Curated annotation (Swiss-Prot):
A motif (CKS-17) lies at residues 414-430. This is Syncytin-2. GO terms for cellular component: plasma membrane. Specific enzymatic cleavages in vivo yield the mature SU and TM proteins. The CXXC motif is highly conserved across a broad range of retroviral envelope proteins. It is thought to participate in the formation of a labile disulfide bond possibly with the CX6CC motif present in the transmembrane protein. Residues 16-478 are extracellular. Residues 500-538 are cytoplasmic. The record marks R350, A351 as: Cleavage.
Length: 538
């Protein structure tokens, strides 16, 4: 009985064991349990080993277009015709920087994160930019877009100041104009388009006061009770539920649509003659890129996935999530034991019917056709996509440190060369005087090595655990999930072997005692039967 109690105590602990080495599988298991899927128990979770298709992209819902937050990154360039006006222009630039507390001035890392990604379902909203000499990020086909907004490719916004007092609070014009298919937008008189985030600075140019007559309803994405609205003065989207209060109009500081359109703009500042001469003088212009601040959300452009869109980008993009290729196999089928890279044991190949994870969750990728019934789908995409974003952030930190190292190297080279060349000017410069190569020490190289060493150690640790297989202690815990279904029959057989002889002996003695009792009763009955005894006459 003690062994039986021990098994009953340990069984829940073994069943609740997680896989810390595979966070995506753990997240998938939690999602299956939280959604009440029939595959939440007694199933296999398998990952794809293909490197050609790292995952699948799913579009965000119309409501998420109003809630996902973006951020802007600003860089500026002096006008090449600016001569002798650096001091007043620099003063104006410092004023402009103070006017944008929500803009980050450190440039992000651009480029696609994944390629060969397939978009599942119809994207509710797509944005198309066709700038000349722009950076192509990828193009989605029109067949996968429900509503497509096209940014005006010929618009150039250049702000001119005619009075000195305006320089203390410079303003940019409204975001670029966008066009849309005829019949897509309907005029709606509602105050939801006049809302603005209370936690953000209202001085930024994308928070210009809304025009009450420019609030348009996107008919393809709206229903009777729920509307998706577009404010054309700020390129902002709003989601309105007619049964709830007006506090729904609180939106992120920078909306996705506003950030995508601003990143295609050519923004500049010029001043008139009373400050800098007799004619209109351009001072500087800005390059603004945009990134998604909400973790787990990505720009989906064709088959490429981006975290940031560069300034002057071109292509057709939407926003969404990236989920890894995880498949489900029912637990009533036999699978080959996972080898995890152990080449000493043979691999078993057989045809197995796998079910995609999102199909097992009961989710249909139909977010592009409406705004109702998609909460569970959006939450699932976001949670799975966040695990990928965490890995990307780790690699981005290492790349950022490398970028800082290059900047530091350039600064040291320029500073030392200037100083040494001045001291050795008579000899033609330091390198010519020494007649050898000049070497420099970069003080941030240790950070790069530490980051790379940590990444290599993590990869090495995972590789060691994978090659050891079931021979190590951690691998033994993983094997419990395979042995657990056989625990019940094995325990029953063990109990039968332990207590079977005793039970058999008790049953045998009981049967023998009953047989003896019956035999004794039969003999007594036969000996006590009455007989007809006649008395003798004698």
């Amino acid at each position: 009985m003690g062994l039986l109690l021990l098994v009953l105590i340990l069984t829940p602990l073994l069943a609740a064991h997680r896989h810390p080495d595979f966070p995506l599988l753990e997240k998938a298991q939690q999602l299956l349990q939280s959604t009440g899927s029939p595959y939440s128990t007694n199933c296999w979770l398998c990952t794809s080993s293909s490197t050609e298709t790292p995952g699948t992209a799913y579009p965000a819902s119309p409501r998420e277009w109003t809630s996902i937050e973006a951020e802007l990154h600003i860089s500026y360039h002096w006008d090449p015709n600016l001569k002798g006006l650096m001091r007043p222009a620099n003063s104006l630039l410092s004023t402009v920087k103070q006017d944008f507390p929500d803009i980050r001035q450190k440039p992000p890392i651009f480029g696609p994160i994944f390629t060969n990604i397939n978009l599942m379902g119809i994207a509710p909203i797509c944005v198309t930019a066709k700038r000349k000499n722009g950076t192509n990020v990828g193009t989605l086909p029109s067949t996968v877009c429900n509503v497509t907004f096209t940014v005006d490719p010929n618009q150039q916004t250049y702000q001119t100041y005619t009075h000195k007092q305006f320089l203390h609070q410079p303003r940019f014009p409204k975001p670029p104009n966008i066009t849309f298919p005829q019949g897509t937008l309907l005029d709606k008189s509602t105050r939801f388009c006049q809302g603005r985030p209370s936690s953000c600075s209202t001085r930024n140019f994308w928070f210009r006061p809304a025009d009450y007559n420019q609030c348009l309803q996107i008919s393809n994405l709206s229903s009777t009770a729920e509307w998706v609205l577009l404010d054309q003065t700020r390129n902002s989207l709003f989601w309105e539920n007619k049964t709830k209060g007006a506090n729904q109009s609180q939106t992120p500081c920078v909306q996705v649509l506003a950030g995508m359109t601003i990143a295609t703009s050519y923004l500049g500042i010029s001043a008139v003659s009373e400050f800098f001469g007799t004619s209109l003088t351009p001072l500087f212009h800005f390059h603004i890129s945009t990134c998604l601040k909400t973790q787990g959300a990505f720009y989906i452009c064709g088959q490429s996935i981006h975290q940031c869109l560069p300034s002057n980008w071109t292509g057709t993009c939407t926003i969404g999530y990236v989920t890894p290729d995880i498949f489900i196999a029912p637990g009533n089928i036999s699978l080959p034991i996972p080898i995890y890279g152990n080449s000493q044991l043979p691999r078993v190949r057989r045809a197995i019917h796998f079910i995609p994870l999102l199909a097992g969750l009961g989710i249909i990728a139909g977010t592009g056709t409406g705004i109702a019934g998609i909460t569970k789908a959006s939450l699932t995409y976001s949670q799975l996509s966040k695990e990928i974003a965490k890995n990307i952030d780790t690699m981005a930190k290492a790349l950022t440190t490398v970028q800082e190292q290059i900047d530091s190297l350039a600064a040291v080279v320029l500073q030392n060369r200037r100083g040494l060349d001045m001291l050795t000017a008579a000899q033609g410069g330091i390198c010519l005087a020494l007649d050898e190569k000049c070497c420099f020490w970069v003080n941030q190289s240790g950070k790069v090595q530490d980051n790379i060493r940590q990444l290599l150690n993590q990869a090495s640790s995972l590789r060691e655990r994978a090659t050891q297989g079931w021979l190590n202690w951690e691998g033994t815990w993983k094997w419990f999930s395979w042995v657990l279904p056989f625990t019940g029959p094995l325990v029953s057989l063990l109990l039968l072997l332990l207590f079977g002889p005793c039970l058999l002996n008790l049953i045998t003695q009981f049967v023998l005692s009953r047989l003896q009792a019956i035999k004794l009763q039969t003999n007594l009955s036969a000996g006590c039967r009455p007989h007809n005894i006649q008395e003798s006459p004698f």
